[in-house]
Curated annotation (Swiss-Prot):
Homodimer. InterPro entries: Cbr1-like_FAD-bd_dom, Cyt_B5-like_heme/steroid-bd, Cyt_B5-like_heme/steroid_sf, Cyt_B5_heme-BS, FAD-bd_FR_type, Flavoprot_Pyr_Nucl_cyt_Rdtase, FNR_nucleotide-bd, Ig_E-set. It catalyses: nitrite + NAD(+) + H2O = nitrate + NADH + H(+). It comes from Oryza sativa subsp. japonica (Rice). It holds the Pfam family FAD_binding_6. This is Nitrate reductase [NADH] 1. FAD binds at residues 708-711, 725-730, 737, 742-744, 792, 795.
Length: 916
């Protein structure tokens, strides 16, 4: 929130006792009849969420603050959202993908297309399903944009604070919001600013995930006008500095090192009666669903969804606009030349001219659908074909015309508009409309592409070509559908229609195909035909089904699918920096999301060397979003099953499974060091991580999967939990990394009770005890260990040291540790290392190296500077057949300090030097 004023002392802090209709139930809660007489199923999502059904608000009455608004007759929208709307939607269910997450309690519609993996939920309905329901979208099918876990709201205890530059700060209960203010009920189309973003990602990857063309929905919203609430609280005049109204939600989010979701609008907007801004508590005649902001959210018609804060807890009137992390680092359209590095370096995020508020004009072709086939025969050519779609604009502007072209814009057909919405008394149009046009089938037969564009009442229209921007927002270029000739049946021809993309990680779309061709053409001149580049020989026209890919899931044949391409990575198993397990964990699967989460652009370019063909999507039997697969003939690894509890006593029963683990304790050991304890799914389980291996911690951060490797510090036989020691890299502390560590800041922001997913074991090194290692599947014995660690790279060394010392006196392995850090305060696990070195002087010798001494008066007795040849010669043994060097730390340290100096010390760098 903007920090221009301090919150004022509340004059009305205690929840009030505004009268609410209804009798007391047996459990003491208020009992209410169903809203609008609509019966609710026993499994309704409204049940069990800590709130009663709502009655319709009392009859409208003039505001008590002297408002001179002209009262208008409100329309009755019940026929649009009556019982027939609910009956057309299948019952919500608890999705297996939510199991083990903070959203496990929420029931959701199973047809929603998930765009960001398991958690948090970001989804859109299938485009055909969205259009089937017409003007009003059932709440269960409304698109969802969540930044984190859904707060568990309770109607009876929820309050909204209104504070800042107001004369009468208040804390309003939900009953007061419903009964104390006149209700307004209007239909409003909500659109995510990222709608159609996947088209931009096909040109160049943005920082956002893959929205398709269904990030748009329309509901009838009921609530209290924001202006009435602000007037009741006595908003101060603009001359007194009351220029902005900030909203803050209830979620605990990782952005900015931990924050709520917040944003703001101007005072002028907030008080403008023509804008119909409300604090909504009902959607389509029902209380809000949890995903849509229960119990109360902001609705700002004509604006992007990102301004409409859900789960509203605070409204603060301020001088400056919100200073919330998400107000600046989200919902911006930056110039096309600005990439992430430039945006951070030159503070483009904070330039006010690039903020998005009102929607732009947009339109989409929904009929013909993607992969729809139109047979060409004597019957179809005698009648027209009706194309259909939707269109919308922002700021209350009405769509005035929609046009379709079959010849690349040379000529245009004017479409018939269906405008179900009447203008408001101020002449505003807050909803989408639909269009249709009948074309001759023979004209379609001669077309290679069809495109649509819309115009609004200000004569704004859509550009022909896509305009890329870093966040991939406000994409509104012509929506183009390719037309191709096919043979659906023997002896018959037809037309197959191809949309530009498919949402999320679903394969298909002409833009993906076009990008693949461009990539191949660009790569071809520099590639040689050889067995290491098999796609040069076999890609042309080669296609595989997912069932074929699943057969290749072992060391003998390891195939993966990434973005619809099939890759044979068998030849790369021995060369992968993370070991063969890093590939085998995903062999035989579509690992698009996980590959993107942990690989650089260089690695992505290298992957194309191993492309052998394209994936055939075979319908409902396949999902590219890390779906649950059935059994296959794997020799080493089991198939992926997301979030399935492993049988006791080992939690990590398969390196492919994501295991949900709950944060049960968090200790702050220093300013930037945290010790986390995560409970395993069952209290009698051990983690099952061999010494030397690591796990992946997986989380969805800012809508994208993030995965990082960590080695627990707890003992391998610890029952019921494991511990992670994490150094938090905060933003704005290192000039080369202004955003800090994405995962470490996320973990630091997690509240106790939250869940993460872990996968493993992973890694190419395992210590089996008494000097015996297994490295890349081959046994190796060592009597002496040279251990060089930097920063948090101490954790795998710590596991090996711990294992050796627990097996005394049998394990006679000698360990020589050189541990580098910036200062003495950055040394992790120092107390344990010093204690062990003192207790076992014949087994463990420790030498610290730091860049600078912060407290010279304490008498620092170890090294200062860098890890040099001199340091290594003095503190680790010479190379030899019985000596093994283990290293873990920043890549520059390994490359420039460790590797060249160990080579000078006669280490066999191919067989006796291991980097974790």
């Amino acid at each position: 929130m903007a920090a221009s004023v301090q919150p004022r002392q509340f004059g009305h802090l205690e929840p009030g006792s505004a009268p609410v209709r209804g009798a007391a139930s047996s459990n003491g809660a208020k009992a209410y009849p169903p809203a609008n007489g609509i019966p609710r199923r026993a499994d309704s999502p409204v049940r069990g969420c800590g709130f009663p059904p709502l009655v319709s608000p009392p009859p409208r009455k003039p505001p008590s603050d002297g408002s001179d608004d002209e009262e208008e007759e409100q329309e009755d929208w019940r026929e649009l959202y009556g019982s027939h709307l609910q009956l057309e939607v299948e019952p919500p269910v608890r999705d297996a993908r939510d199991e083990g997450t903070a959203d496990a309690w929420i029931e959701r519609n199973p047809s929603l297309i998930r765009l960001t993996g398991k958690h948090p939920l970001n989804c859109e309905p299938p485009l055909a399903r969205l259009m089937h329901h017409g003007f009003i979208t059932p709440a269960a099918l409304h698109y969802v944009r969540n930044h984190g876990a859904v707060p568990r709201g309770d109607w009876s205890t929820w309050t909204v604070d209104v504070t800042g530059l107001v004369k009468r700060p208040m804390r309003l209960t939900m009953d007061e919001l419903v009964n104390g203010f006149p209700a307004v009920e209007i239909p409003v189309t909500l659109v995510c600013a990222g709608n159609r973003r996947k088209e931009q990602n096909m040109v160049q990857q943005t920082v956002g995930f893959n929205w398709g063309a269904a990030g748009v929905s329309t509901s009838v919203w009921r609530g209290a006008r924001l202006r009435d609430v602000l007037r009741r609280c006595g908003i101060m005049p603009s001359k007194g500095g009351a220029l902005n109204v900030c909203f803050e939600g209830a979620e605990d989010l990782p952005g900015g090192g931990g924050s709520k979701y917040g944003t703001s609008i101007t005072r002028q907007w907030a008080l403008d009666p023509s804008r119909d801004i409300m604090l909504a508590y009902m959607q389509n005649g029902e209380p809000l669903l949890p995903d849509h902001g229960f119990p109360v959210r902001a609705i700002i018609p004509g604006c992007i969804g990102g301004r409409m804060v859900k789960w509203v807890k605070r409204i603060i009137v301020t001088t400056a606009e919100s200073d919330n992390y998400y107000h600046y680092k989200d919902n911006r359209v930056l110039p096309s030349h600005v990439d992430a590095e430039l945006a951070n370096a030159d503070a483009w995020w904070y330039k006010p001219e690039y903020i998005i508020n009102e929607l732009n004009v947009n339109s989409v072709i929904t009929t013909p659908g993607h992969d729809e086939i139109l047979p060409i025969n004597g019957i179809t050519t005698q009648r027209g074909y009706t194309m259909k779609g939707y269109a919308y604009s922002g700021g209350g502007k009405r769509i005035t015309r929609v046009e379709v072209t079959l010849d690349g814009g040379e000529t245009w057909l004017v479409c018939v508009l269906d405008l179900p919405e009447k203008p408001t008394k101020y002449g505003k149009h807050w909803c989408w409309c639909f269009w249709s046009v009948e074309v001759e089938v023979l004209d379609l037969l001669g077309a290679k592409e069809i495109a649509v564009r819309a115009w609004d009442q200000s004569h704004n229209t859509q550009p022909e070509k896509l305009i890329w921007n870093l966040m991939g927002m406000m994409n509104n270029c012509w929506f183009k559908v390719k037309v191709n000739v096919c043979r659906p049946h023997k002896g018959e021809i037809g037309l197959v229609f191809e949309h530009p993309t498919q949402p999320g990680n679903q394969t298909g779309g002409w833009m993906a195909r076009q990008k693949h061709l461009e990539t191949a053409e660009a790569a071809a001149p520099g590639l040689k035909r050889s067995t290491s580049t098999p796609f040069m020989n076999t890609t042309d026209g080669k296609q595989f089904t997912m069932s074929e890919v699943r057969k290749h899931s072992s060391q003998d044949s390891a195939w993966i699918v990434v973005h619809g391409h099939v890759y044979d990575c068998t030849a790369f198993l021995k060369d992968h920096p993370g070991g063969a397990d890093s590939i085998l964990i995903n062999a035989g699967t579509d690992c698009t999301e996980e590959f993107d989460a942990i690989h650089s652009d260089k690695a992505k370019a290298l992957l194309d060397t191993y492309r052998i063909g394209e994936l055939i999507t075979t319908g409902a039997g396949y999902s590219s979003d890390n779906s649950v697969h059935g059994a296959s003939n794997l020799s080493q690894l089991a198939p992926i099953r997301e979030a399935i509890k492993a049988p006791a006593p080992v939690a990590l029963s398969s390196p492919r499974d994501k295991v949900p683990c709950q944060l049960v304790d968090k200790k702050e050991l220093s300013r930037d060091v945290r010790l986390f304890r995560f409970a395993l799914p069952s209290s009698d389980q051990v983690l099952g991580l061999p010494v030397g291996k690591h796990i992946f911690v997986c989380a969805s951060i800012e809508g994208k999967l993030c995965m990082r490797a960590y080695t627990p510090t707890s003992m391998v036989d610890e029952v019921g939990h494991f511990d992670l020691l994490i150094k938090v890299y905060f933003k704005n502390e290192h000039p080369k990394f202004p955003d800090g560590g994405l995962m470490t800041q996320y973990l630091d922001s997690l509240p106790v009770g939250a869940y993460i997913d872990v996968k493993g074991p992973l890694g190419h090194v395992e210590y089996t005890g008494r000097g015996e290692f297994v490295i890349n599947g081959k046994p190796r014995n060592a009597r002496r260990l040279a251990m060089i660690a930097g920063g948090s790279g101490i954790t795998p060394m710590y596991q090996v040291i711990q294992s050796v010392l627990r097996d005394q006196p049998e394990d006679t392995t000698e360990m020589h540790l050189v541990y580098a850090n910036r200062t003495e305060d950055d040394i992790l696990l120092r107390d344990e290392l010093d204690r062990w070195a003192a207790e076992y002087p014949d087994r463990l010798k420790v030498w610290y190296v730091i860049d600078q001494v912060k407290r010279p008066e304490e008498g620092w007795k170890y090294g200062v500077g860098f890890v040099t040849e001199e340091v290594l010669r003095e503190h680790v043994p010479e190379g030899g057949d019985d000596t093994l060097a283990l290293a873990c730390g920043p890549p520059p340290m390994i490359k420039f300090a460790v590797s060249p100096n160990l080579e000078k010390m006669k280490y066999d760098m191919a067989n006796s030097f291991i980097v974790f």
